[in-house]
């Protein structure tokens, strides 16, 4: 492919597996296979005119917003927790999970007028959720082992992300409310969108077709 190579930021972990399957079907290149073959965090696919970089999921939006990557794959939880100036053309339908409110299954209702203590890494999402309900919650920032906070008396509830709920149940927690349904989104740097309009349009449409095929049940 002619022209400047376009950098795509893909998150490490499970989303790398799922996004690689989409790119392979859409463009014939697998970020995971390319990156597995090197110790570097970047690998080129010259035939597609792309360079893939593998970074922490929480950092993808920053790389794209500031132009270090033209395109990225980001969970909706990250985008809504810290809004960015990004073009968000496509729900990829992968990495599905939920941001929820959970409490200990043996927790007693709080006295009327008492603000609940809520442990979470989603400070903005949690604050907005309880504010919408008119509840003046005390938000306690944590970055790991959030599920144990209620049993240790640190918090009355947590706001966390879950896929199956198994870790919550293992720690005696029950889901009480949904905060946000989450899936991975394709995001694009706005300057890159102007500089590489046609190439990025083709990339987006190729992924859109694959996502539509995946979402549509096949008739037998």
Swiss-Prot record:
Chief location of this protein within or outside the cell: cytoplasm
KW Amino-acid biosynthesis (keyword) present: yes
Pathway: Amino-acid biosynthesis; L-histidine biosynthesis; L-histidine from 5-phospho-alpha-D-ribose 1-diphosphate: step 1/9
UniProt GO BP: L-histidine biosynthetic process
PROSITE patterns xrefs: ATP_P_PHORIBOSYLTR
Annotated function: Catalyzes the condensation of ATP and 5-phosphoribose 1-diphosphate to form N'-(5'-phosphoribosyl)-ATP (PR-ATP). Has a crucial role in the pathway because the rate of histidine biosynthesis seems to be controlled primarily by regulation of HisG enzymatic activity.
HAMAP family: HisG_Short
Protein name: ATP phosphoribosyltransferase
């Amino acid at each position: 492919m002619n022209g400047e190579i376009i950098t795509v930021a893909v998150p490490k972990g499970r989303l790398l597996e799922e996004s690689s399957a989409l790119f392979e079907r859409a463009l014939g290149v697998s970020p995971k296979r390319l990156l597995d073959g090197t110790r570097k965090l970047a690998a080129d696919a010259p035939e597609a005119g792309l360079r893939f970089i593998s970074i922490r999921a929480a950092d993808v939006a920053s790389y794209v917003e500031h132009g270090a990557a033209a395109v990225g794959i980001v969970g909706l939880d990250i985008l809504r927790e810290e809004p960015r100036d990004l073009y968000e053309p496509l729900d990829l339908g992968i990495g599905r999970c939920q941001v929820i409110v959970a409490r200990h299954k043996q927790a007693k209702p709080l006295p009327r007028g008492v603000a609940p203590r809520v442990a979470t890494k989603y400070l903005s999402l949690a604050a907005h959720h309880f504010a919408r309900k008119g509840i003046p919650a005390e938000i306690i920032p944590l970055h790991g082992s959030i599920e144990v906070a209620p049993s240790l008396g640190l918090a009355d509830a947590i706001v966390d992300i879950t896929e199956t709920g198994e870790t919550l149940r293992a720690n005696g927690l029950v889901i009480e409310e949904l905060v946000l349904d989450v899936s991975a989104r394709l995001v694009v740097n706005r300057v890159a969108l102007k500089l590489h309009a046609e190439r990025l349009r083709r990339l987006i449409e190729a992924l859109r077709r694959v996502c539509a095929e995946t979402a549509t049940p096949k008739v037998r």
